[in-house]
Amino acid sequence: ALNLLSGGSDSPVAAWCMARRGLALHHIHFASPPYTSLRAKLKVRDLARELVEYTGNCTLFVVPYTKPQEYIRDNAPDVLFTVLMRRSMLRIANQVAKKLELQALITGESLAQVASQTMAALACTDQAQDLPVLRPCIGMDKIEIINISRKIGTFETSIEPYEDCCTIFTPPHPKTNPTLDEILAAEAAMPGLAALEAEAAENVEKIYIRMGDDELL
């Protein structure tokens, strides 16, 4: 499976949950320079290294996401930005996963934790692509997730204050109950998005994560 690894505490816990069930996985991260920094990318690399004792050797794929994200920001209704961005990320992750012959995506989403994680928003997000989306944290609250992150050794890295692309351009009042019809209408008004997503998927950076890499931290 391919785990969507952000810089927060949720997605490393999701990876750990699936790895302990014996699922082999790789990670994918979305970077949007200059809005996100090199240090933010290195933070995610460090998280992947901290997880390697559970996941085994794997690859971190870093997606250059600036162009798709700017395009959505400039062409979509502000209140739908977050769900449209999540759909875009899943489509790119789907393309990368299928090239690797992986069978599912993993996210750290927790029900109703933020606006993009309501039932309505998740239903709209899932429809964007056709791989199963595994959400092992879906029924956990933030305290449970943080407690696990402390146990597995990712908490301190997760709280380092570096931005990630999920938090830039976030509207002040995102819609929590979007309908699929309005999401599809918004995407129909962005005919250039698919090409930008394909370009991003083709130009991923590969960072190989190996047992013993923690000695280099």
Where are these regions (language model features)?
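Short alpha-helix adjacent to the SAM-binding motif of class I
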Residues: 39-50, 92
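Active-site adenylate/phosphate-handling loop in enzymes that bind or generate adenylated species
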Residues: 65, 69-70, 74-147, 151-152, ...
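Structural beta-sheet core signal
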Residues: 3, 27-29, 62, 107, ...
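Conserved beta-strand segments of alpha/beta enzyme cores
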Residues: 24, 59-61, 132
